[in-house]
Amino acid sequence: MRVGVYPGTFDPITLGHMDIIRRGAKLVDRLVIGVTTNITKSPLFDDDERIAMVKREVAAIEGDIQVVGFNSLLMDFAQREGATVIVRGLRAVADFEYEYQMAGMNQQLNDRIETVFLMADVGLQPIASRLVKEIAIFGGEIHKFVTPAVCKAVIARIAERGLRQGER
């Protein structure tokens, strides 16, 4: 059985993430979406909320897809899941530099697990969770970048935390 891992913070999960999940699920028998905390980021949603959000969003995608949280080195997590492939999405050259370096480090940690890069769909390339949150904080429309359920959750969380800025 070919198992792949698609790791990310998914804060929030975007249409770009969904595209990579759909396509990644076709490449493996089981795709494990690893929801993690990035210690360099300040999340809008906590781990449990992000895991639940991702589970809801991927429920209709065809294939054996599991969503789990992890808080360890990616390669340790991938090995525990029995993965032979790490799936990563690339939007632009800047992503490639970072991802190339990470793939090299991961290969040093475990050379039995390959990293596979999927290019983002052209229409989804500019989408980034960080930008979605920023746009929402300033009152911009985010419905083009996330599903309706995620849009509602992001707007509600920003209001709940009093993060709204600027005038519209």
Curated annotation (Swiss-Prot):
It catalyses: (R)-4'-phosphopantetheine + ATP + H(+) = 3'-dephospho-CoA + diphosphate. Pathway: Cofactor biosynthesis; coenzyme A biosynthesis; CoA from (R)-pantothenate: step 4/5. Its cofactor is Mg(2+). The keyword Nucleotidyltransferase applies. Substrate binds at T9, K41, L74, R88. ATP binds at T9, F10, H17, G89, L90, R91, E99, L124, Q125, P126, I127, A128, S129, R130. One of its GO terms (biological process) is coenzyme A biosynthetic process. The keyword Magnesium applies. GO terms for cellular component: cytoplasm. Disulfide bonds: none annotated. It is an enzyme of class 2 (transferase). Pfam families: CTP_transf_like. The record marks H17 as: Transition state stabilizer. One of its GO terms (molecular function) is ATP binding. Keywords: ATP-binding, Coenzyme A biosynthesis, Cytoplasm, Magnesium, Nucleotide-binding, Nucleotidyltransferase, Transferase. Coiled coil: none annotated. It is found in: Cytoplasm. It comes from the Bacteria. Transmembrane segments: none annotated. Homohexamer. This is Phosphopantetheine adenylyltransferase. It comes from Sphingopyxis alaskensis (strain DSM 13593 / LMG 18877 / RB2256). The lineage of its organism: Bacteria, Pseudomonadati, Pseudomonadota, Alphaproteobacteria, Sphingomonadales. The gene is coaD.
